[in-house]
Amino acid sequence: MKGENLEEKKEFPITRLHLVLIMLAAALIVCAIGTFLPVDQETMSNVSRELEEIRSFIRNLDFLSASLYIFSHNLILCLVMFIPLFGVGFGMYVMLSSGYAIEIDALTHQVPPPLVFVSLFLMPYFWIELISYASAMSQGILIAWGLYKKEFKRTLTETLKIIGIVTALLFTAALIEAAFFFAFA
């Protein structure tokens, strides 16, 4: 009887921290892979134009509006990553697409894409965003586990806490990213 009760309450096989670190490593690897995808001239031209339109749009905003624009974009992506299991696939797609956009932007400016990717490691907002995304994808996995174990209340409480944390982190990252954008644009 006691053994069955312990089995029902068994925790997820690894700690939350380890799961976040695994998701963080996977996101970095997938983003890096995106910087090596083949790019044809038409795609490069179209994506490069879109990136420049976004930069131009942000350039015409004041600092707070630019921060809110960046924040809302990143938060929407991050919230989708909380969806059990689907969120991990979506998050990896976002990371692959980000790597691809980095590659196209780098090639447009005649800079080696891996160098641009690695240089992002110096940007604090890069790490804050990545940790937020890894936390959301991890929580999506833990939501699935909680639903499987029928621990709805605990899972909901944990999820709301993580949503609050990543929201604060992404707002901070957006302020830093906007500051970098205006300082070096």
Label for each model-derived stretch:
Residues 10-45:
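N-terminal signal-anchor transmembrane alpha helix
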Residues 35-42, 82-108:
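Transmembrane alpha-helix/helix-exit interface in multi-pass inner-membrane proteins
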Residues 40-63, 104-118:
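Membrane-interface interhelical connector segments
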Residues 26-30, 77, 169, 173, ...:
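Alpha-helical transmembrane segments of multipass membrane proteins
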Residues 2-15, 65, 76, 152:
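Cytosolic juxtamembrane amphipathic/interface segments immediately preceding
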Residues 56-85:
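Interfacial helix-start motif at the membrane-water boundary
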